[in-house]
Swiss-Prot record:
InterPro entries: SDHF4. It comes from Saccharomyces cerevisiae (strain ATCC 204508 / S288c) (Baker's yeast). GO terms for biological process: cellular respiration; cellular response to reactive oxygen species; mitochondrial respiratory chain complex II assembly; positive regulation of succinate dehydrogenase activity. Residues 71-98 have a biased composition (Polar residues). The gene is SDH8. This is Succinate dehydrogenase assembly factor 4, mitochondrial. The keyword Mitochondrion applies. Residues 71-138 are annotated as: Disordered. It is found in: Mitochondrion matrix. Residues 1-32 form a transit peptide. Plays an essential role in the assembly of succinate dehydrogenase (SDH), an enzyme complex (also referred to as respiratory complex II) that is a component of both the tricarboxylic acid (TCA) cycle and the mitochondrial electron transport chain, and which couples the oxidation of succinate to fumarate with the reduction of ubiquinone (coenzyme Q) to ubiquinol. Binds to the flavoprotein subunit SDH1 in its FAD-bound form, blocking the generation of excess reactive oxygen species (ROS) and facilitating its assembly with the iron-sulfur protein subunit SDH2 into the SDH catalytic dimer. One of its GO terms (molecular function) is enzyme activator activity.
Length: 138
């Protein structure tokens, strides 16, 4: 069969890789990579760039961090974080001050539905199991 292909004069098309192997040039679009234009903000003048770098070094120094922390501890707007309501609760648990529900009926039987031992407040009133705005059906 190989002889039949040679005798018919059929030639395989030459691809770029074959031309490389045979030492022949091939046409392939090449991109010129330059670093002349890089996207980004415009360059600062030399004096302003030096001042910016100096301020960056000062801002990242330990002295500046300590000064900021001292200023933040003296800030009176964070007093609400130290309120007894928030400090006595465990993280991730519901606080009893916020989760108190007002019962809609007295006793063990719901007069509207006849349910025995069910919730005292309808959990589906707002479309999900929520009590005082806290969702409990994850």
């Amino acid at each position: 069969m190989l002889c039949a292909i040679k005798s018919t004069g059929y030639r395989y098309p030459r691809t770029g890789a074959l031309n490389l192997l045979r030492g022949r040039p091939f046409n392939m679009a090449t991109r010129k990579i330059t670093t002349e234009r890089i996207p980004g903000p415009p360059k600062l003048p030399r004096e302003e760039q030096e001042e910016f770098e100096r301020l960056q070094r000062i801002a990242t120094s330990q002295e500046a961090i300590d000064q900021y922390n001292a200023q933040a501890t003296g800030d009176r707007t964070k007093e609400s974080l130290n309120s007894p309501l928030l400090t006595k609760n465990d993280i991730g648990s519901f606080s009893p001050e916020f989760s108190k529900t007002i019962p809609e009926f007295e006793g063990d039987v719901n007069p509207k539905t006849g349910e025995v031992g069910g919730p005292k407040q309808d959990p589906l009133r707002h479309g999900d199991y929520s009590f005082n705005g806290r969702v409990t059906d994850f």
